[in-house]
Amino acid sequence: MSLLEQLARKRIEKSKGLLSADQSHSTSKSASLLERLHKNRETKDNNAETKRKDLKTLLAKDKVKRSDFTPNQHSVSLSLKLSALKKSNSDLEKQGKSVTLDSKENELPTKRKSPDDKLNLEESWKAIKEMNHYCFLKNDPCINQTDDFAFTNFIIKDKKNSLSTSIPLSSQNSSFLSLKKHNNELLGIFVPCNLPKTTRKVAIENFNRPSPDDIIQSAQLNAFNEKLENLNIKSVPKAEKKEPINLQTPPTESIDIHSFIATHPLNLTCLFLGDTNAGKSTLLGHLLYDLNEISMSSMRELQKKSSNLDPSSSNSFKVILDNTKTERENGFSMFKKVIQVENDLLPPSSTLTLIDTPGSIKYFNKETLNSILTFDPEVYVLVIDCNYDSWEKSLDGPNNQIYEILKVISYLNKNSACKKHLIILLNKADLISWDKHRLEMIQSELNYVLKENFQWTDAEFQFIPCSGLLGSNLNKTENITKSKYKSEFDSINYVPEWYEGPTFFSQLYLLVEHNMNKIETTLEEPFVGTILQSSVLQPIAEINYVSLKVLINSGYIQSGQTIEIHTQYEDFHYYGIVSRMKNSKQILETNTKNNISVGLNPDILEVLVKIHNTEDFTKKQFHIRKGDIIIHSRKTNTLSPNLPNTLKLLALRLIKLSIQTHALSDPVDLGSELLLYHNLTHNAVKLVKILGTNDISINPNQSLIVEVEIIEPDFALNVIDSKYITNNIVLTSIDHKVIAVGRIACQ
C-alpha cells in the first residue's frame, strides 16, 4: 500500500472516530443528566450521613470517656453543671435513643451508653427533687441553716432512710459520697486548683471567719449593749406646769388716762456738754445745792471726802456728781449722770431733768454722743472754760470737741420738729476777774461759728457768764432761802455792773414755762422705753424679777400691763408684767415717794418687772443690757382699748441712713470702717453703698443716702418704725471724728 493510501485510510478512521465520539458524547449528555443528578444526591446523602455518623460517634465517644472517670470540683465546668440541671429527662432519653438508632443504621462501631451515665442522669433528677424538697422543709427545726453543709447532710440523711432496704451498702455509700461531693462543688467555697494546698486551706479558713461587715456590726452591737447595761433609768419627775403667758393683763388701777396726762407735770430736759475740765460737774453740783436738792449735812460729808483728794481737780460740789471712786481719783467725769428735779422752785406742774456728760476724749463719744441721741433734750448747755489759754487750747488742739459737739447738735436742731435752745455758759469768769474784753472776744468767735457755719439764729442761743465754783450768776441769792444762818457753801453772787443779762436759772425757768405749751403726750403714741440700767434680783418664791431703769421715749405705761423686752444680741425676747414703778433719781439723796401707777414720756422710772419663766429664760442665761428696748405687748388690745397697736419693730444688720456730711479732711471710701451711734449703742459698721450716685466715696457737705452693715456677727440694731421716734444717728471715724449726722431711713 502506498503512502497516500495509508494517509487516506488514517483520515477516514480519524473522521469516523470523531463522529462516534460526538454521538457518544451527545447521548451521554442526554442520558446521564438524570443519572448525574441521582448520583450527586446519593453522594451528598452519603457525605451528610458520614458527617452525621462521625459527629454522633464523637459525641458517643466523649460521653463514654466522661463516664470513665468521676467528675470533681476542678474538672467539671460551671456551664456543664448548669446544663445538666436545665435539660429535661425526656430530651435526654430521646437524644439517647436517636444516637443508638443512628449508630445501628450506619453500622458504625460505637460504644454503648454505660449504665453509670444513666445513673448520673437519674441522680441529677433526684438531686433537683431533693433541692426542692429541702427548700420546702427549710423551716424544719432539725435542719441547721447556719451550717454550710446543711443541705448536703439533709440529702445524705434522707438517702440513708430511703435506700436502706433497697440498695446494697456498698453502692449506697458510693452514691452518697459522690452526691455529697457533687453538692459541695455546687455550694462550697471555690478555690482555684492551681493553688498550693496550704494556700487553699488558708483561703477556706478566711472564708469561714466573720466578714468585715460582721465585725463592724458586732462591735456596734457590743457597744450598744454596754451602754444599755450602764444605763440607769430613773423615774422622771413630772414637769411643773408653767404659768401660761397672759398677753392681755389689765392695769392694776383703773385710771382716766386723759385727765392724768392733762395734770401730769411737763418735763424739760437739759444736757450739759463741754470739754474736759470745763467745770460742768462743779457747776451742776452747785446748781443742785441752790435748788435744795442737797442738804447741808450732805455737803459737809462731801467736803470731808474732797479734802483727801487733789484740790486742783476736786471740790465739794464736783464730788456730788463724780460719785464713783475711779472718777474722784482721776479728777474727771467718766459716766453720764441723770438728775430729775421736782420742787417748789420750778414752775407749777413742771419738772427738770439735768444730764451731765463726760468731757474727756476717751469717753466723749461713748457717753456724750449716746446721751444726745437717747435723751433728745430740749436745751443744750455748752460750758466753756474762759480762763486764759484754756479757750485757745480747746480750739487749736488736735481734738476740737467743741466743734464736734456743735456739728451734732446743730443738725439735730435743724431737723427737729421742735427747735432746740442753746445756752453757752462762759464758766470760770472769776478766774479772769470778769474781764469784759475777753468775754466779748469769746462770745464774738462763737457767735460767728454758730451763725455762719451752723445756721443758728439769735433767738436760739444765749451767752451767760458765770462761776460754777462760787455760784456767781447761777441764781439770785434772794430767791433761795436755805437757812437763816449763812453757810460756807452759799453762792458768792458777784456780778459786775456792766452785765445786764439773765442768770442761768432764770433762763431755765423761762424755758420751762415755754416748754409747757408744747404738745402733750397723746393716746396714739406707742409705748417705747430704753433701758438705762439693768439688775437681776434674787428669785422670790421661784418667780424671777428684774429691776430696770427705763427712759420712756414715747407713749405711756401702767402698772400691771404686759411688756416685751427686746434684746439686741439674741433672737428671742422676754415677756414680763410691770409690778411697780417709781420715780428715779441718781443723786445722793432721794425723796422716798409712793409708787406711781402711770409713766409718761420723758419720765425716767425704776420699774420692777416680773419675767415670765419661759424656756429662753434661766437664771444663768439672762441677758438684758443697757440700750435694750421695751414696748407694749403687740398682742394686747382687748382689755386696754386705748393701747396703740401700730408699732413696727425692726432688727437690722444692713441699715439705710439719710445723712448730712460736714467738713472732712479726707473723703471716706466705700468699704471703710466707721462707728454708728444710735441711742445708747455704738457699733462698728462698714460703708457698703452710696445710693443715687456713682460716687465711690463720701465727700464734705453732702446730703446722701448710704447703706452700712454691722460688722459684729451676733448683733442686730433694734429700730422702732414710728413717726413718734426720731431714730437719729451719728457716724464717726475710728478716731472719733464726726463724719455725718442723720437718721435711719426705715422705709
UniProtKB/Swiss-Prot annotation:
Keywords: Cytoplasm, GTP-binding, Nonsense-mediated mRNA decay, Nucleotide-binding, Phosphoprotein, Protein biosynthesis, Repressor, Translation regulation
Region (G2) residue spans: 331-335
Gene Ontology biological-process entries: nonfunctional rRNA decay; nuclear-transcribed mRNA catabolic process; nuclear-transcribed mRNA catabolic process, 3'-5' exonucleolytic nonsense-mediated decay; nuclear-transcribed mRNA catabolic process, non-stop decay; protein catabolic process; regulation of translation; translation
Modified residues (Phosphoserine): S88, S90
Keyword Nucleotide-binding: yes
Domain called tr-type G: residue spans: 265-503
GO cellular component: a single term: cytosol
Region (G3): 356-359
UniProt region (G1), positions on chain: 274-281
Chain positions recorded as GTP binding sites: 274-281, 356-360, 427-430
Biased composition, class Polar residues, residue ranges: 21-31
Described function: Represses the expression of non-poly(A) mRNAs like L-A or M viruses and is therefore involved in antiviral system. Mediates interactions via its N-terminus between the exosome and the SKI complex which operate in the 3'-to-5' mRNA-decay pathway. By interacting with NAM7, is also required for nonsense-mediated 3'-to-5' mRNA-decay (NMD). May recognize a stalled 80S ribosome at the 3'-end of a nonstop mRNA which leads to the recruitment of the exosome and SKI complexes to the mRNAs to be degraded.
Other observations noted: Present with 233 molecules/cell in log phase SD medium.
Subunit relationships: Interacts with the exosome and with the SKI complex composed of at least SKI2, SKI3 and SKI8. Interacts directly with SKI3 and SKI8.
Official protein name in the record: Superkiller protein 7
Native species: Saccharomyces cerevisiae (strain ATCC 204508 / S288c) (Baker's yeast)
